[in-house]
UniProtKB/Swiss-Prot annotation:
Protein name: ATP synthase subunit b
HAMAP family recorded: ATP_synth_b_bprime
GO terms of molecular function: proton-transporting ATP synthase activity, rotational mechanism; proton-transporting ATPase activity, rotational mechanism
Assembly notes: F-type ATPases have 2 components, F(1) - the catalytic core - and F(0) - the membrane proton channel. F(1) has five subunits: alpha(3), beta(3), gamma(1), delta(1), epsilon(1). F(0) has three main subunits: a(1), b(2) and c(10-14). The alpha and beta chains form an alternating ring which encloses part of the gamma chain. F(1) is attached to F(0) by a central stalk formed by the gamma and epsilon chains, while a peripheral stalk is formed by the delta and b chains.
InterPro entries linked: ATP_synth_B-like_membr_sf (IPR028987), ATP_synth_b/b'su_bac/chlpt (IPR002146), ATP_synth_F0_bsu_bac (IPR005864), ATP_synthase_B_chain (IPR050059)
Function, in words: F(1)F(0) ATP synthase produces ATP from ADP in the presence of a proton or sodium gradient. F-type ATPases consist of two structural domains, F(1) containing the extramembraneous catalytic core and F(0) containing the membrane proton channel, linked together by a central stalk and a peripheral stalk. During catalysis, ATP synthesis in the catalytic domain of F(1) is coupled via a rotary mechanism of the central stalk subunits to proton translocation. Component of the F(0) channel, it forms part of the peripheral stalk, linking F(1) to F(0).
Gene3D superfamilies the UniProt entry points to: F1F0 ATP synthase subunit B, membrane domain
One Pfam family in the UniProt entry: ATP-synt_B
Annotated localization: Cell membrane
């Protein structure tokens, strides 16, 4: 080695290496800056817009879901209130119908009782009339046989039978009143 030349340093590279390395670094920096970086920024902007759009869409969907939930809650409250009104109206209607049916049944029972009473009274009157005529005929026949004369006069025999039956009824009524006391 010559005295004027120095030995290359291990830590410090040669000047031409530094210059060429700086030129290549600047060229790569310009290429990245000019071509790659705009594409990366465009891709990042697209992703940012997509994420922001997704967040906005999710917020709108959440707002719609909250509105739908509030509407459904209101409808549920209204439906429960309507069901309560319907139940109450059904109770009122049932009590009205039950009262009407009870009133109708009472009226029907009274009508049937009155009809039965009238029918029994009519049959009793018919039986009394029938028995009077038969008893009268038998009494006249019996009296005719006992006294040996004919009691053919209808008016006189009818009056006799009626008087006899009236006396019989009066004695029966007196007997009932006396035994009841």
């Amino acid at each position: 080695m010559a005295a004027g030349e120095e030995a290359p340093s291990i830590l410090l590279p040669a000047v031409y290496d530094i210059v060429w390395s700086a030129v290549v670094f600047v060229v790569l920096l310009v290429v990245i800056w000019k071509y790659a970086l705009p594409r990366v920024y465009a891709m990042l902007d697209g992703r940012t817009e997509a994420i922001a759009g997704g967040i906005e869409k999710a917020e709108r969907a959440q707002a719609e879901a909250d509105a739908a939930k509030a509407e459904l809650t209101a409808q549920l409250v209204e439906a429960r209130a309507e069901a309560g009104r319907i139940r109450e109206q059904a109770r009122v209607d049932a009590s009205v119908i039950a009262a009407e049916i009870k009133e109708q049944a009472t009226a029907d029972a009274a009508r049937i009782t009155a009809s039965g009473t009238q029918q029994i009274e009519a049959e009793r009157q018919q039986a009394v009339v029938s028995l009077r005529s038969e008893v009268g005929s038998l009494a006249i026949d019996l009296a005719s046989g006992v006294i040996g004369q004919s009691l053919a006069d209808d008016q006189r025999s009818t009056a006799l039978v009626d008087r006899f039956l009236a006396d019989l009824e009066a004695s029966e009524t007196a007997g009932r009143t006396g035994s009841a006391s």
